[in-house]
Structure formats: structure tokens, C-alpha cells
Curated annotation (Swiss-Prot):
The keyword Zinc applies. It catalyses: Endonucleolytic cleavage of RNA, removing extra 3' nucleotides from tRNA precursor, generating 3' termini of tRNAs. A 3'-hydroxy group is left at the tRNA terminus and a 5'-phosphoryl group is left at the trailer molecule. Pfam families: Lactamase_B. Binds 2 Zn(2+) ions. The lineage of its organism: Bacteria, Bacillati, Bacillota, Bacilli, Lactobacillales. Its cofactor is Zn(2+). The gene is rnz. Its EC number is 3.1.26.11. SUPFAM superfamilies: Metallo-hydrolase/oxidoreductase (SSF56281). It is an enzyme of class 3 (hydrolase). It comes from the Bacteria. Zn(2+) 2 binds at residues 67-68, 212, 270. It comes from Lactobacillus helveticus (strain DPC 4571). This is Ribonuclease Z.
Length: 312
């Protein structure tokens, strides 16, 4: 599991930062990639990575402001040229389906694969697929905006080989069944329950994506115990009043949430163009005073998310 940031800027593209998009790479887990927001020129950014659009199966849109959706029609069109790509699902606020369909219709663009739209209107579970669940909750922005919480199911514990030694079970299907927690019957009639021979479950990983919003209680619910929290940081910590007036957040507000909700790593994104170059480091340094494991991400940065217990 890995995050790759395709755009980390706010409002408009700059020479240093493109507008919002981040890819959650689940290649080892599902052989899929999920995108969160698709700002203008996201597909150009993808060309500079090893991401293949045929692997993109789900797109989650936080809200319908242009810097988060203007790249969507072009990306969907280009995906048609990737061969047999399979269906794609887009999750987003009311209006995203209309935006996509009108854009494709007016440009007379035909896509070669089915697109399913899931409209976000209320908090809760929106996706459950092959060991992963995605939850959403409303944020506080000028227009309807949603945050996302991706939760991986727990993994079975290790098979306790020493505990099984007395049964002299050879390598083969029976051990595989026991490792899955199944019940098996040995040649002598002994019945073994696989769950009795497994170590403690390994908790799944949690990734939370919070784009445009000002401080609001729903962020805490989405961020709780996250391995990685991606949080918008449009303004510096000493500009909380301005952030509130413009329905955005500061780096310090993001850090406080990370500390309060037992987050492991905080990634600051959605950086205003007013913080160019080294000025952006101000946001990171302010946040680190509150939550040390903070990183200010740049376009194309990659964040590995190891299994719990395997961190180096």
C-alpha cells in the first residue's frame, strides 16, 4: 500500500505544485489504484509516474470545485485508449455525474467502458470491496465537501507451527486450510480448528483523506487511529481567522487533529501558492511543533504504508 501525490497545490496550478490529486496504490493487495480528486492536468502528472490508467478502478471526489475535478473528463477519455480496462466507479457529491456526462457529451467523447456513479449525500460506508471499506463524512466548505476514510480488514495471524508439530502434518493443502482458520479432519479422525493455531490478528491499515474544509468535528471521526492522514493545509498556523473565513484549514489545525486522534503520520497538502519554495516549510515547522511526525508533501512524493508491526 502506497500513496503517491499527483498534485499538492491549492486553487490554481503553479510551477511547483499542480492542483489536487492523490493516488492510493493497492497493487499488491488488489492490483488496483484508487484516485482521490482529479484536478486539471492530473493525467499529465500521471505520465511522470509508473501509474497506468487501466489500474484505476475507483475515483473519489471530495467536492466539485474546479481545482479538484477539471482533470476528470480528459482522464476518463484517455483511459479508453488503454485497452480492455474494465469498469470504473466514481464517488462524489451531487453534480459530479452531470459534470462528467455533459463534458463527454459536448465534446462528443465516447468511453469504451462502463462508468458507475455513486452520489454522496450522507455520512457512512460507501464502498466495501475485497478486504477494504471506505467511509465518508461531511466536511465544512463553501459547497458540499466530503472526507474519506479507507479501512483495510484485519489479516489472520501467523500459523503457529510449533503448536501443530505433534500432529505431524506435512506441507500441503491441510496447512493452507488451517492458516485460513478453517476446520480440518486428519487421517486418524482428529478434528482441528484452524483458529486455535493462529497467532493474534494483524490490524489492517487506515488512510484518511481530508481536502477542502475548515475545522469541523467530522474530521476527528475520519482521522481516528489513521496510519496516514492527508490533510489540507491551505494556510499557516497564524492565519486561522483567514482560513475560517475562506472555509479552509491551517497546518496547526491539521497537526492538532493528528495528535488528538492518534494518527501515525500527517501529510500536509493543498498548499496555497502564497507559500512558494522555502516559505512552504513554515507550514511544516509549525505543524511539527504540535505533531512531530509531519511531512509537507510535494508533487510526486510517495509514502509507503507498511503493515502494522512490520514498520522499519
Amino acid at each position: 500500500m502506497e500513496l503517491q501525490f499527483l498534485g499538492t497545490g491549492a486553487g490554481q496550478p503553479s510551477k511547483q505544485r499542480n492542483v489536487s490529486s492523490v493516488a492510493l496504490k493497492l497493487l499488491d493487495e488488489l492490483n488496483e489504484i484508487w484516485l482521490f480528486d482529479v484536478g486539471e492536468a492530473t493525467q499529465h502528472q500521471i505520465l511522470r509516474t509508473n501509474i497506468r490508467l487501466r489500474k484505476v478502478t475507483k475515483i473519489f471526489i471530495s467536492h466539485n470545485h474546479g481545482d479538484h475535478i477539471f482533470g476528470l473528463p480528459g482522464l476518463l477519455s484517455t483511459r479508453s485508449f488503454q485497452g480492455d480496462v474494465g469498469p470504473l466507479t466514481i464517488y462524489g457529491p451531487p453534480g459530479i455525474e452531470q459534470f462528467v456526462k455533459v463534458s463527454l457529451k459536448v465534446s462528443r467523447t465516447k468511453v469504451s467502458y462502463p462508468i458507475k456513479f455513486v452520489e454522496l449525500t450522507k455520512p457512512g460506508l460507501i464502498c466495501e470491496d475485497k478486504g477494504f471499506r471506505v467511509y465518508t463524512d461531511r466536511l465544512d466548505h463553501r459547497i458540499p465537501s466530503f472526507g474519506f476514510r479507507v479501512v483495510e480488514d484485519s489479516h489472520p495471524g501467523e500459523l503457529l507451527i510449533d503448536k501443530l508439530a505433534k500432529y505431524n502434518i506435512p506441507n500441503g493443502p491441510l496447512l493452507g486450510q488451517l492458516k485460513r482458520g478453517d476446520q480440518v479432519t486428519l487421517a486418524d479422525g482428529t478434528v482441528l480448528n484452524g483458529k486455535d493455531f493462529l497467532g493474534a490478528e494483524k490490524p489492517g491499515r487506515i488512510v484518511t483523506i481530508i481536502y477542502d474544509t475548515r475545522s469541523t468535528p467530522s474530521i476527528a471521526r475520519l482521522a481516528k487511529d489513521a496510519d496516514v492522514l492527508v490533510h489540507e493545509s491551505t494556510f499557516a498556523g497564524d492565519e486561522a481567522k483567514m482560513a475560517h473565513n475562506y472555509y479552509h484549514s491551517t497546518s496547526v489545525q491539521a497537526a492538532k487533529i493528528a495528535k488528538q486522534e492518534n494518527v501515525k503520520k500527517l501529510c500536509l497538502s493543498h498548499i496555497s501558492a502564497r507559500y512558494m519554495g522555502n516559505k512552504a516549510k513554515k507550514l511544516e515547522s509549525q505543524a511539527k511543533k504540535v505533531f512531530p511526525n509531519t511531512i509537507l508533501v510535494n508533487d510526486f512524493d510517495q509514502i509507503n504504508i507498511p503493515m502494522k508491526g512490520s514498520e522499519k
